[in-house]
Structure formats: C-alpha cells, structure tokens
Design a protein with these regions (language model features):
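C-terminal nucleotide
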Residues: 1-12, 16-23, 27-52, 58-87, ...
C-alpha cells in the first residue's frame, strides 16, 4: 500500500532552525506542506529522512489530530542526541505535519518559540500556481553542506530579513516581491553555507533560470530539487506543486 504522507518545501529562512545559526539572530522559517503527487528521491532536500521516520509512526497517512502536536512528536521521535549527535531541523517535521503555509520563529533553540499557520484558500492557490520543482541529482555521498560554513550576524540578518519579506509578499500576493525575497533568502543561505552549491548545481540553475523569476535548492542543498518561482504555466519537465489543505485526510 502506498504511503500518502506529505513532503515539505522550505520557502525562506532555511537554516534558522539550527541554534548555531539562530544564536546570531532570531527569525522565521517558512514552509509549505505538499501532497505526495510523486515519490521524491532520497537525499533530495525534500525531508525524506524525516518522512521515513514518520512512516514508522504513521505508515500510510497522518491522523486527523493536532498538527503541531504531531510535528513535535515526530521531531522528538526522529532525533536522539544521545545516539546521533545531530539534530534534524524542526522545519522538516513541521513542514510535513502542519498543512498549508506555516512560519516558525527560532531563537537559539531547536524547537520554535511560536508557529503561525495560514490557510486562506485564495492565497494558497496563488502560491502553488507560482511554484514548481525540477529534479537535479541526489546529494552525493560524502557531501557535507556545512563544510566551510561562514555564519555571521550580518549574514543571518540577511536571511531573516528575506524571510520576513517573503511572508509579507505572500500575504499581499505580490509576485515580484515574493520572487525577490525568495532569491534573497537563497543567496543568504549559500553565503553562509557555500558547499550547498555542489558540482553540477550551477549548470541546472543556468538551464532553468530563463524560465523562472527566482530559484532555490530545496532543503540543505548539495543537489536534489530546484524550487522555481514562475509566472505562467509549469515549464515542460518541471513538477507542479500541490499544497496540502487543512483536514485533507
């Protein structure tokens, strides 16, 4: 039986869910929960490791239950600092379990101080009509996206400012503002984590740049999927996005 568990797309503020980033400045991460219209590849920035952990609790679909509670449960289930020493960012569990558009505020802790959910149908329809995904390649074994990281207060401010502007542009359905903030958020990410731009990524970006207003890599980068902001039909070869609505069980 096929699993109907959602995936997530991180729109802006990626990496702020790690305390070693938010210690330099608090801010929001923005995610949307998306329907599993295809089975996305592993090591592709689509939170498949967190989704695989979720399958151990809910093999086929999420229960009709408090979404934030499920996200907290999944986050705690996946992460064992005594054993692993590495904590997956909370944005993955939140992005999978919490429907619609969400932003979560991080301030030097693994779990956000607060979460805001948005379910306006016209806005979600607008947002998904301007997003699509394109496949690149799985993040290669041995690839460390944190190698050479350079985190400074100024770079974190650039990230958090972009996330603030991205949210506001979505609320106003301002496509150009959304694309600009989306791009600024990605640029802030790679300024702190240059190893996200693994060999071969730039070629894919160059290929799709003429067909998009903005782009970013999903998740931690190093490969995976490009998320494109578009103005018009989904380009041939790209994957449409379907945002999961509340109570769509």
């Amino acid at each position: 039986m096929t699993s109907h568990l959602p995936y997530r797309i991180d729109l802006a503020g990626t990496w702020i869910d790690q305390p070693y980033v938010s210690r330099y400045g608090a801010g929001w991460a923005l995610t949307v929960s998306i329907e599993p219209t295809i089975e996305f590849m592993e090591r592709g920035g689509m939170s498949t490791s967190t989704r695989n952990a979720a399958k151990k609790i809910w093999p086929y679909e999420l229960p009709n239950y408090n979404e934030e509670m499920m996200a907290r449960l999944l986050f705690c289930f996946e992460n064992d600092p005594e054993r692993d020493g590495h904590i997956s960012g909370a944005q993955d569990a939140i992005g999978i379990c919490m429907s619609g558009l969400n932003r979560h505020f991080y301030d030097n802790h693994f779990w956000p101080e607060r979460i805001e959910s948005y379910h306006d149908e016209e806005t979600l329809s607008w947002l998904e009509s301007h997003l699509c995904l394109v496949e690149m390649f799985p993040r290669r074994k041995g690839c460390s996206v944190v190698a050479g990281m350079d985190i400074t207060p100024e770079k974190v401010r650039a990230l958090t400012s972009a996330a603030d502007r991205c949210w506001q542009a979505i609320m106003e359905r301002d496509l150009n503002g959304f694309a600009a903030a989306f791009s600024d958020s990605f640029n802030a990410q790679i300024a702190m984590f240059p190893a996200m731009m693994a060999e071969g990524v730039e070629e894919h970006i160059s290929r799709w740049k003429p067909q998009s207003l903005a782009h970013k890599m999903s998740g931690a980068g190093g490969g995976g999927y490009l998320v494109l902001v578009i103005d018009g039909p989904v380009p041939e070869g790209a994957i449409p996005v379907k945002i999961r609505r509340k109570d769509s069980f």
